Regions:
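PLP-dependent aminotransferase class I/II
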Residues: 16, 52-172
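Residue-level signal for short amphipathic helical patches enriched in basic/charged
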Residues: 1, 36, 94
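Short clusters of hydrophobic/aromatic residues that line enzyme substrate/ligand-binding pockets
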Residues: 13, 22, 39, 80, ...
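Conserved PLP phosphate-binding loop immediately N-terminal to the Schiff-base lysine helix
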Residues: 1-32
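Active-site PLP attachment segment
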Residues: 24-63, 86-91
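Hydrophobic alpha-helical segments, especially transmembrane helices
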Residues: 12, 35-38, 44, 107, ...
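Hydrophobic residues in well-ordered beta-strands that form the structural core
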Residues: 5-7, 41, 49, 170
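Alpha-helical hydrophobic/aromatic positions enriched in membrane-embedded helices and signal peptides
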Residues: 19, 26, 43, 77-78
Length: 172
C-alpha cells in the first residue's frame, strides 16, 4: 500500500524492540529533547531515517526550506528554522556519552521497583511486552485501586507519596 511508517519515539531514547533500536524501525523516527525526557536539552528533537530522499526533505524543512544542493538563498520548500543551537548540542553531546549506562540503570531500577511493589494490593504495574528488549523507562507506570486503600482517592494517594519524598504524579 506504500504507507510510510513514522515512529513516535519521543520518550524512547535508547529503547529497543526485538533488539532493534526504536527510531530505526519505520521510515522516520522522531525523538524529543523536551526537558522531562531522558535525553534533554530543554526543547527540540531529532528525526532519524535511512531513506536519503526523506532525509533531504527533512533537512530542507528544518533549514528554512533550503535545498542541500542549492544556494543558501534558494528555498524550494516552505520550511522553518528548526536548527539546534550550539548550547543545546553541547548539552546533548555530553549526555550521549552516558546514554546507554543511564538506560541500563533505569532498567535495573524499574525492575527493582516493580519487584518491590508487586505484592502491594491495589498497586498494579504493567508487564513489559517481551519484545521490548531495552525499555526506556521514561516513566514508571502503575495502576492504583482506591478500593484497596479504603477509598483513598488517587490524588490523595499521590499527595501522600510526595509528602514522603516519593515523587509521583498522575499520567496523561
Amino acid at each position: 500500500h506504500d504507507i510510510r511508517l513514522i515512529e513516535d519515539a519521543a520518550q524512547a531514547h535508547a529503547a529497543a524492540w526485538k533488539e532493534q533500536r526504536v527510531g530505526a524501525i519505520g521510515d522516520l523516527g522522531t525523538f524529543s529533547f523536551q526537558a522531562s525526557k531522558n535525553l534533554n536539552a530543554g526543547e527540540g528533537g531529532f528525526i532519524t531515517t535511512s531513506n536519503s530522499e526523506l532525509a533531504q526533505r527533512v533537512w530542507s524543512l528544518h533549514n528554512c526550506g533550503r535545498s542541500p544542493e542549492g544556494a543558501w538563498y534558494e528555498h524550494p520548500l516552505i520550511g522553518g528554522n528548526y536548527r539546534l543551537g550550539e548550547f543545546q548540542a553541547g548539552l546533548l553531546l555530553s549526555q550521549l556519552k552516558s546514554l546507554d549506562t543511564l538506560a541500563e540503570r533505569r532498567s535495573r531500577n524499574g525492575k527493582a521497583l516493580s519487584d518491590a511493589i508487586e505484592d502491594i494490593e491495589g498497586i498494579d504495574t504493567t508487564e513489559p511486552d517481551e519484545r521490548i528488549t531495552t525499555h526506556a523507562y521514561h516513566l514508571f507506570v502503575m495502576r492504583y485501586s482506591a478500593a484497596a486503600f479504603n477509598g483513598l482517592s488517587r490524588d490523595h494517594f499521590i499527595e501522600a507519596l510526595n509528602a514522603e519524598g516519593i515523587p509521583c504524579s498522575a499520567g496523561y
